[in-house]
Amino acid sequence: MESFSSKSLALQAEKKLLSKMAGRSVAHLFIDETSSEVLDELYRVSKEYTHSRPQAQRVIKDLIKVAIKVAVLHRNGSFGPSELALATRFRQKLRQGAMTALSFGEVDFTFEAAVLAGLLTECRDVLLELVEHHLTPKSHGRIRHVFDHFSDPGLLTALYGPDFTQHLGKICDGLRKLLDEGKL
Protein backbone atom coordinates (compact mmCIF):
# COMPACT_ATOMS: atom_id res chain seq x y z
CA MET A 1 0.00 0.00 0.00
CA GLU A 2 1.32 3.40 -0.97
CA SER A 3 1.76 5.85 1.89
CA PHE A 4 0.67 9.34 0.95
CA SER A 5 0.43 12.33 3.21
CA SER A 6 -0.73 15.69 1.90
CA LYS A 7 0.64 17.34 5.05
CA SER A 8 4.07 15.85 4.39
CA LEU A 9 3.88 16.86 0.73
CA ALA A 10 2.83 20.41 1.66
CA LEU A 11 5.69 20.69 4.16
CA GLN A 12 8.16 19.42 1.57
CA ALA A 13 6.86 21.94 -0.99
CA GLU A 14 7.00 24.75 1.57
CA LYS A 15 10.62 23.94 2.48
CA LYS A 16 11.57 23.71 -1.21
CA LEU A 17 9.86 26.99 -2.03
CA LEU A 18 11.43 28.78 0.92
CA SER A 19 14.89 27.44 0.09
CA LYS A 20 14.59 29.03 -3.36
CA MET A 21 13.38 32.34 -1.92
CA ALA A 22 15.72 32.94 1.02
CA GLY A 23 15.98 36.61 0.21
CA ARG A 24 15.23 39.58 2.41
CA SER A 25 11.47 39.69 1.76
CA VAL A 26 10.89 36.08 2.85
CA ALA A 27 13.37 36.36 5.70
CA HIS A 28 11.35 39.21 7.23
CA LEU A 29 8.41 36.83 7.61
CA PHE A 30 10.52 34.73 9.98
CA ILE A 31 13.29 37.05 11.19
CA ASP A 32 12.54 40.19 13.21
CA GLU A 33 14.24 43.58 12.82
CA THR A 34 16.79 43.06 15.62
CA SER A 35 17.81 39.64 14.29
CA SER A 36 18.13 41.17 10.84
CA GLU A 37 20.46 43.87 12.19
CA VAL A 38 22.62 41.23 13.91
CA LEU A 39 22.75 39.22 10.67
CA ASP A 40 23.75 42.35 8.74
CA GLU A 41 26.60 42.97 11.19
CA LEU A 42 27.70 39.32 10.98
CA TYR A 43 27.74 39.73 7.19
CA ARG A 44 29.98 42.81 7.47
CA VAL A 45 32.33 41.00 9.85
CA SER A 46 32.50 37.98 7.55
CA LYS A 47 33.10 40.16 4.51
CA GLU A 48 35.90 42.11 6.18
CA TYR A 49 37.48 38.99 7.67
CA THR A 50 37.37 36.85 4.51
CA HIS A 51 37.85 39.75 2.07
CA SER A 52 35.20 37.99 0.00
CA ARG A 53 31.75 39.42 -0.57
CA PRO A 54 30.42 36.20 -2.18
CA GLN A 55 31.70 34.05 0.69
CA ALA A 56 30.11 36.36 3.28
CA GLN A 57 26.83 36.39 1.36
CA ARG A 58 26.84 32.59 1.08
CA VAL A 59 27.29 32.04 4.84
CA ILE A 60 24.50 34.48 5.75
CA LYS A 61 22.21 33.07 3.07
CA ASP A 62 22.87 29.56 4.41
CA LEU A 63 22.14 30.77 7.95
CA ILE A 64 18.84 32.33 6.86
CA LYS A 65 17.81 29.23 4.89
CA VAL A 66 18.50 26.96 7.86
CA ALA A 67 16.72 29.28 10.31
CA ILE A 68 13.65 29.45 8.08
CA LYS A 69 13.55 25.69 7.50
CA VAL A 70 13.85 24.92 11.21
CA ALA A 71 11.15 27.52 11.96
CA VAL A 72 8.84 25.91 9.38
CA LEU A 73 9.47 22.45 10.81
CA HIS A 74 8.76 23.69 14.34
CA ARG A 75 5.68 25.68 13.32
CA ASN A 76 4.23 22.67 11.51
CA GLY A 77 4.71 20.40 14.53
CA SER A 78 7.16 18.13 12.71
CA PHE A 79 9.28 17.43 15.78
CA GLY A 80 8.48 14.55 18.11
CA PRO A 81 8.94 14.69 21.91
CA SER A 82 12.62 13.69 21.84
CA GLU A 83 13.27 16.21 19.07
CA LEU A 84 11.48 18.94 21.02
CA ALA A 85 13.85 18.18 23.90
CA LEU A 86 16.75 18.61 21.46
CA ALA A 87 15.23 21.90 20.25
CA THR A 88 15.10 23.11 23.86
CA ARG A 89 18.70 22.02 24.37
CA PHE A 90 19.73 23.84 21.18
CA ARG A 91 18.00 27.02 22.30
CA GLN A 92 19.69 26.80 25.73
CA LYS A 93 23.11 26.30 24.11
CA LEU A 94 22.51 29.17 21.69
CA ARG A 95 21.41 31.38 24.59
CA GLN A 96 24.51 30.34 26.58
CA GLY A 97 26.66 31.21 23.55
CA ALA A 98 25.01 34.62 23.21
CA MET A 99 25.49 35.39 26.93
CA THR A 100 29.12 34.26 26.71
CA ALA A 101 29.70 36.42 23.62
CA LEU A 102 28.16 39.39 25.48
CA SER A 103 30.28 38.77 28.55
CA PHE A 104 33.45 38.59 26.45
CA GLY A 105 32.44 41.83 24.71
CA GLU A 106 31.65 43.71 27.92
CA VAL A 107 34.47 42.59 30.22
CA ASP A 108 37.95 43.43 28.96
CA PHE A 109 40.58 40.68 28.74
CA THR A 110 38.10 37.82 29.24
CA PHE A 111 37.80 36.67 25.62
CA GLU A 112 38.75 33.07 24.91
CA ALA A 113 38.23 31.92 21.32
CA ALA A 114 38.25 28.24 22.33
CA VAL A 115 35.31 28.70 24.74
CA LEU A 116 33.11 30.47 22.19
CA ALA A 117 34.17 28.11 19.38
CA GLY A 118 33.32 25.15 21.62
CA LEU A 119 29.84 26.49 22.36
CA LEU A 120 29.17 27.09 18.67
CA THR A 121 30.37 23.58 17.84
CA GLU A 122 28.02 22.15 20.48
CA CYS A 123 25.15 24.18 18.97
CA ARG A 124 26.00 22.80 15.53
CA ASP A 125 26.02 19.21 16.77
CA VAL A 126 22.69 19.53 18.61
CA LEU A 127 21.06 21.23 15.60
CA LEU A 128 22.33 18.52 13.25
CA GLU A 129 20.89 15.88 15.56
CA LEU A 130 17.57 17.76 15.70
CA VAL A 131 17.12 17.99 11.92
CA GLU A 132 18.79 14.69 11.04
CA HIS A 133 15.57 13.08 9.76
CA HIS A 134 13.89 16.25 8.49
CA LEU A 135 16.38 18.04 6.25
CA THR A 136 18.50 16.92 3.33
CA PRO A 137 22.26 16.32 3.43
CA LYS A 138 22.60 19.61 1.53
CA SER A 139 20.90 21.44 4.42
CA HIS A 140 23.13 19.57 6.88
CA GLY A 141 26.08 20.91 4.89
CA ARG A 142 24.68 24.43 5.22
CA ILE A 143 24.47 24.00 8.99
CA ARG A 144 28.08 22.83 9.11
CA HIS A 145 29.15 25.69 6.85
CA VAL A 146 27.53 28.35 9.04
CA PHE A 147 28.71 27.03 12.39
CA ASP A 148 32.20 26.12 11.15
CA HIS A 149 32.57 29.62 9.70
CA PHE A 150 31.54 31.44 12.88
CA SER A 151 33.43 29.09 15.22
CA ASP A 152 36.71 29.72 13.37
CA PRO A 153 39.13 30.88 16.10
CA GLY A 154 40.73 33.33 13.66
CA LEU A 155 37.41 35.01 12.92
CA LEU A 156 36.46 35.09 16.60
CA THR A 157 39.84 36.56 17.57
CA ALA A 158 39.48 39.22 14.86
CA LEU A 159 35.91 40.00 15.99
CA TYR A 160 37.07 40.66 19.54
CA GLY A 161 40.13 42.59 18.34
CA PRO A 162 40.51 46.35 17.90
CA ASP A 163 39.64 46.40 14.17
CA PHE A 164 36.12 45.07 14.73
CA THR A 165 35.14 47.00 17.88
CA GLN A 166 32.28 48.84 16.17
CA HIS A 167 30.86 45.62 14.67
CA LEU A 168 31.17 43.78 17.99
CA GLY A 169 29.35 46.60 19.78
CA LYS A 170 26.40 46.42 17.37
CA ILE A 171 26.29 42.62 17.56
CA CYS A 172 26.33 42.74 21.37
CA ASP A 173 23.57 45.38 21.40
CA GLY A 174 21.43 43.16 19.19
CA LEU A 175 22.13 40.02 21.21
CA ARG A 176 21.32 41.85 24.46
CA LYS A 177 18.00 43.03 23.01
CA LEU A 178 17.13 39.52 21.73
CA LEU A 179 17.96 38.03 25.14
CA ASP A 180 15.96 40.71 27.00
CA GLU A 181 12.93 40.11 24.75
CA GLY A 182 13.19 36.33 25.22
CA LYS A 183 13.72 35.75 21.50
CA LEU A 184 17.02 33.97 21.99
UniProtKB/Swiss-Prot annotation:
This is Tumor necrosis factor alpha-induced protein 8-like protein 2. It is found in: Cytoplasm; Nucleus; Lysosome. May interact with CASP8; however, such result is unclear since PubMed:19079267 could not reproduce the interaction with CASP8. Interacts with RAC1. Belongs to the TNFAIP8 family. TNFAIP8L2 subfamily. It holds the Pfam family DUF758. InterPro entries: TNFAIP8-like (IPR008477), TNFAIP8_sf (IPR038355). Phosphorylated by TAK1/MAP3K7; this phosphorylation triggers association with BTRC and subsequent ubiquitination and degradation. Expressed in T-cells, B-cells, macrophages, neurons in the brain and brainstem, and stratified squamous epithelia of the esophagus, cervix and skin. PANTHER family: TUMOR NECROSIS FACTOR ALPHA-INDUCED PROTEIN 8-LIKE PROTEIN 2, TUMOR NECROSIS FACTOR INDUCED PROTEIN. Keywords: Cytoplasm, Immunity, Innate immunity, Lysosome, Nucleus, Phosphoprotein, Ubl conjugation. GO terms for cellular component: cytoplasm; lysosome; nucleus. Acts as a negative regulator of innate and adaptive immunity by maintaining immune homeostasis. Plays a regulatory role in the Toll-like signaling pathway by determining the strength of LPS-induced signaling and gene expression. Inhibits TCR-mediated T-cell activation and negatively regulate T-cell function to prevent hyperresponsiveness. Also inhibits autolysosome formation via negatively modulating MTOR activation by interacting with RAC1 and promoting the disassociation of the RAC1-MTOR complex. The central region was initially thought to constitute a DED (death effector) domain. However, 3D-structure data reveal a previously uncharacterized fold that is different from the predicted fold of a DED (death effector) domain. It consists of a large, hydrophobic central cavity that is poised for cofactor binding. The modification Phosphoserine is found at residue 3. Changing residue 3 to A: Complete loss of interaction with BTRC. One of its GO terms (biological process) is regulation of apoptotic process.
